[in-house]
Amino acid sequence: MQLLSQYWGSLNDRKNLQKNFDLDAIFPALLNSLMIAVPVISSTFAAVERFLINCKSESSLGTIIIDEAGQASPHMLVGALFRAQKAVVVGDPKQIEPVQTVQDLFVEKIGGEGIGKYRSKELSVQSLADAQNPFAGIIKNLDGSESWVGCPLVIHRRCKNPMFTVANELSYGGFMINKTMEPKESIEPCKESCWITYDTSNIESTIGKDRYIQLQGQIAFELIQKLRARNVEFKDIFIITPFTSVAYGFKKYMESLSNDIVNWTKEDNKKDWLDDNIGTVHTFQGKEAKVVIYMLGCQSDDSANGAIKWVNANNVNVAFTRAREYIYVIGDAVKWAELNKNLAFAQRYLPIYTLKDF
């Protein structure tokens, strides 16, 4: 135990231990000893390199489990996979994709012939594992193509309709079966799940890549107030958006409103709600709430056409499946239906209103 505390203690303790022992040689014994007391050890891709710095032998670990593998780029796993005897890869390739910071031109030039599919920026640990899995299901995509998904879990237990139907038909080809139970304490919304549009004639273009629309922020706030009047708590409401600038803009707007106008209470914990319940789709993976407000942002003129087209099925799927009971989409219904096939598909299952209809 003394050796364990020295190795995983402070940096000075490890340096002192290194004076008397070859850390590479004793690491397997130290790890085995640790796992007698702690059978399962968790880490992150960012931290596992340092954790295994003295583990340099192939297949020296037992089984590693990679969670949320659909978000991980393959190169992040190479070191841990080299050291493991077995790997269990768990994730959803139809949800959040890896965040890739490498420039497109570099990705195109670095690879040789015959490896085109491995140069995709959307390639994940999950998709590579699925490609090697003989036990799989074929999912038909909205564009008619097919995806090979290893050992798919087909029972869904989170969302009511229309969220389930939109996600199931958009991303899973109708593959899933909905077994979501009725909530023990259901809420009484001010309106059914719907798309909220608005008059776009006075919306001005914003600068650069800022996609926040003040009118959408005002609509979202009014909707929150109407939900609060129906005893829906702040903690049960997520504000999700495809764009960082929209999340930032709405958070600043909410901060600018006086506490009396918003009617915050001590139980609401204003700071935590602003930090945790407003954000981009990427920050809500694995989370859920009774109500989701999906704020699309984007100007109605041509300045945001590229941004509108950028929002893919994975983004829509994650946003919709965060909502257990109700979803409200805020955006220019005409523009999004015209330029984005994924949101156009979602509109089939959502009545379109303006805030005056509430």
Regions found by a protein language model. Name each.
Residues E113-I203, K209:
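Interdomain helical connector at the RecA1-RecA2 junction of SF1/SF2 helicase-like NTPases
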Residues N168-E255:
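Conserved helicase/translocase motor-coupling segment
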